[in-house]
A protein has these predicted regions:
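Conserved polar/disulfide-associated segments of primarily extracytoplasmic proteins
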Residues: 9-13, 39-147, 153
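N-terminal "mature-domain start" segment
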Residues: 8-43
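Short, solvent-exposed mixed-charge patches
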Residues: 158-159
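Hydrophobic single-pass membrane-targeting/anchoring helices
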Residues: 1-5
Length: 159
C-alpha cells in the first residue's frame, strides 16, 4: 500500500487517498486502496475485474485482458469497430480509433447502459490487449476522473 500523498496547490492542500497495486492475470494497475475488487465472469461483456468505490456502487473501474500476439492498435480499432457496428444503436458511442489517454495511444469509446455509462480505454502492451472501463452515473464522470487517469497511466502487462 502506498501512503496518502499530499499535493499543494497555492494555499490549498489536497489529500490523495492511499493506493495499492492490483495484479490480475497478466495485468497490474494502481487502484484506490479502499475500493473493493470482484471478478465478474458472467453477464454481459467480457470476463473482468470490477473495482468499486466504497462511497457509490455505480462508480467503478472494469479491467479486461486478452492475449493478442502480433496485434496492432489499428487492428484492435478495426476489430472493435466491427463489434460496435453489429451492436444495437446507441449502446456504444464516441468511438475514437486513435485517441491518447493519460499520455498513451489508445482506442476509446463510451458504453451507455441504463443508470450508468462506461468510458472504455483500450491499450496494447506487448502481446496483451488491456481494456480499462471507467463507470459512473450519467453526468458524474468527475467522481472518478483522477482514479481513471491513474488506472490508465499505471496499467501494464506483467510476466
Amino acid at each position: 500500500r502506498a501512503p496518502a500523498a499530499v499535493v499543494r496547490h497555492g494555499a490549498t492542500t489536497l489529500q490523495r487517498p492511499p493506493t495499492t497495486l492490483l495484479v490480475e492475470g497478466r495485468v497490474a494497475l494502481t487502484i484506490p486502496a479502499d475500493w473493493s475488487t470482484q471478478r465478474v465472469v458472467s453477464g454481459p461483456g467480457s470476463a473482468r475485474v470490477q473495482v468499486t468505490s466504497p462511497a457509490d456502487p455505480e462508480v467503478a473501474l472494469h479491467v479486461t485482458q486478452s492475449p493478442v500476439p502480433g496485434e496492432t492498435l489499428p487492428g484492435t480499432a478495426q476489430r472493435l469497430k466491427r463489434a460496435i457496428d453489429a451492436s444495437p444503436a446507441g449502446v456504444f458511442v464516441d468511438f475514437n480509433p486513435s485517441d491518447i489517454r493519460a499520455g498513451r495511444p489508445a482506442v476509446t469509446y463510451r458504453e451507455v447502459r441504463a443508470g450508468h455509462q462506461v468510458r472504455w480505454t483500450i491499450l496494447l502492451d506487448g502481446a496483451v490487449r488491456i481494456s480499462v472501463g471507467c463507470q459512473s452515473g450519467p453526468g458524474h464522470e468527475d467522481l472518478l476522473r483522477e482514479v481513471c487517469a491513474q488506472a490508465v497511466r499505471s496499467v501494464h502487462a506483467v510476466g
